Every structure is written in C-alpha cells, then in structure tokens.
Design a protein with these regions (language model features):
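Active-site acidic catalytic loop and adjacent metal/ATP-binding pocket
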Residues: 1-20
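Alpha-helical, largely C-terminal catalytic domains
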Residues: 6, 30, 70
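Active-site activation/catalytic loop segments of kinase-like enzymes and analogous catalytic loops
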Residues: 14-56, 73-100
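Charged/polar, solvent-exposed surface patches and flexible loops
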Residues: 26, 49, 65, 69, ...
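Helix N-terminus capping/helix-initiation residues
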Residues: 32-33, 59, 120-121
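Generic alpha-helical secondary structure signal
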Residues: 38-42, 61, 122
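All-alpha amphipathic helical-bundle segments outside canonical DNA-binding/catalytic cores
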Residues: 57-74, 116
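ATP/Mg2+ or Mg2+-diphosphate-binding catalytic cores
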Residues: 75-144
Length: 144
C-alpha cells in the first residue's frame, strides 16, 4: 500500500492507481444484484475490518466515497461494447428473449460463441443494476 497525497489508499492489484474502494466495487459489480443488496453492508464491514487488522485503517466515509465514485468506471466499461453485443443478439432474435439470470448462460449444449454473448449480456445487466443501486444507496450525486 502506498499513501497518497489525498485521503485514499492505493492498491496495486492491477498495476494501476485504482483505489482500494474502487477495486472492491470492481470485485462486487458482477454479483447477483439481490445478493449485493442484501450483503453489501457486511461485505464492506469485513473489508474495512481486514484492512484495519493489517495496519491500514480506512474510514468508512472515505471508503464509501471512493466506492460510489468507482462505480462510474464499471458503468462506462460495462457500456463500452454493449451496442455491438446487443446488436448481435438482436440480429439472432435472442435479445428479446433474454431474462435475468438467463439459464442459457450455463447451457453446455449451446454454441460456445453464442453462450459467451449471452453471458456478456447477463454480466452487463448485473453491472448496470449494481452500479445504479450502489449510486442510489451511497448518494453518488453528492459524492460527485
């Protein structure tokens, strides 16, 4: 961990300057939205507890500020290839049939390329849903 000049701690997990809270937003944004809604507070508490135990205390307010701001990165990355992905699924008459937690994501008999596209759509659904929920829960507007 490297102390920054502003109130954040940096984690070089991905050889970049994403802060710790942003990394956790990244780690959790593919979780099932209902699961994250239910368990987010306990997950955050555990992360802060572990960092404190390891000698790197982070205040919950600082964590939440960086966490909610970090959702912007996931929102942008999630939408980056979305038009091409959805256009492809639409041209195959699949877009209209997608459902949350689509069982086709784990259909071993489906063409692997098509299954990958359906999984991509599900991951993007989770990304947008989780990011919007986090933004609402932790007052993104005020943090921004």
């Amino acid at each position: 961990m490297i102390e920054a000049r502003f109130p954040a701690r940096f984690d070089w997990q991905q050889s970049c300057v994403n802060n710790v809270a942003q990394e956790w937003a990244w780690n959790w944004h593919f979780l099932e939205p209902d699961f994250l809604n239910e368990h987010e507070e306990r997950l955050i508490h555990k992360v802060l507890e572990v960092y404190k135990t390891l000698g790197h205390p982070i205040s919950k307010d600082q964590f939440l500020n960086a966490y909610v701001l970090g959702t912007v990165q996931m929102f942008v990355f999630g939408g980056g290839g979305l038009q091409l992905l959805m256009a492809g699924l639409h041209s195959q008459k699949i877009f209209e049939t997608l459902v949350p937690n689509d069982p086709r994501c784990s259909d071993e008999h489906m063409d692997a390329v098509l299954r990958e596209k359906i999984v991509g759509a599900e991951m993007t659904r989770r990304t947008f849903t989780n990011c919007c929920n986090i933004m609402r829960r932790h007052d993104f507007f005020s943090a921004w």
